[in-house]
Amino acid sequence: MPLEQRSQHCKPEEGLEAQGEALGLVGAQAPATEEQETASSSSTLVEVTLREVPAAESPSPPHSPQGASTLPTTINYTLWSQSDEGSSNEEQEGPSTFPDLETSFQVALSRKMAELVHFLLLKYRAREPFTKAEMLGSVIRNFQDFFPVIFSKASEYLQLVFGIEVVEVVRIGHLYILVTCLGLSYDGLLGDNQIVPKTGLLIIVLAIIAKEGDCAPEEKIWEELSVLEASDGREDSVFAHPRKLLTQDLVQENYLEYRQVPGSDPACYEFLWGPRALVETSYVKVLHHLLKISGGPHISYPPLHEWAFREGEE
């Protein structure tokens, strides 16, 4: 069974269409909502552009490192609303009489999630701890009642897409730090031009290989990654130059091995776990990590970002 649930890429100017179960934006439903769920979920995709947020509301943590301005400013999110199509109340009341109000609220909530992801990426690059009070004051503001779900969804998104985990180190005062998932010591942030951590992509590639056995054909890797908009030959994805990242950078870092399949003619290539990956993690840990985030046996990927700016990129 394919590792991902297929989704169609669409350009930001064309809007977004439903893309299946967007992992990282599904598992953070409020407990009461989960208990009351009696029917299948329906999804609404909302595009959130941080450039639309007034400057006074944009998160700007102190002591941001050089190059922080090159961080992505546009994030596409999926807002999941539970539908209770079989309920008698809905049949009696009919369609919502406040569709515009509901849509406006969803957009506002998505904008806050986008702001928080941006804020957390800046904190990670600066290697700075942060507190709940700082998030509430700098980002969440008037949405404090919705902080738990906003924080949970933003944290899940960071884990899956970027391979970054939020860890609470001091319960009193709620002090947090950001670390790479699974104890991996690589994040790809080696220079000022590096915009986002690459650990998430590494974990997904390692999971694809683990799922296939000891090795995975190159075409299988690109097939699975196509849903991440990191397909072979696509150099404008969130993971800039994905082919170079997989076949050179991660090979040089000893996380992956990239070799020709013995006896193949024409030449075919395959990926294997490198020695560094075998030392730092395991097949079981990688697969369990993705299953834990997805909350079920089927792994799917969220729609990734369409970056508004590429400052510092070649």
Swiss-Prot record:
All disulfide bonds of the chain are none
| Source organism, top-level taxon | Eukaryota
The protein's organism comes out as Homo sapiens
Which Gene Ontology BP terms does the record give? negative regulation of transcription by RNA polymerase II
In terms of InterPro entries, this protein maps to: MAGE, MAGE_N, MAGE_WH1, MAGE_WH2, MHD_dom
GO MF terms here are: histone deacetylase binding
- Pfam family name, one: MAGE
**Which protein are we looking at?**
Melanoma-associated antigen 12
Which parts of the sequence are annotated with region: Disordered?
1-72
Q: Which SMART domains does the record associate with it?
A: MAGE (SM01373), MAGE_N (SM01392)
The MAGE domain covers which part of the protein?
109-308
Reported tissue expression: Expressed in many tumors of several types, such as melanoma, head and neck squamous cell carcinoma, lung carcinoma and breast carcinoma, but not in normal tissues except for testes.
Give the GO cellular component terms, alphabetically: nucleus
Q: Where is the composition biased (Low complexity)?
A: 17-44
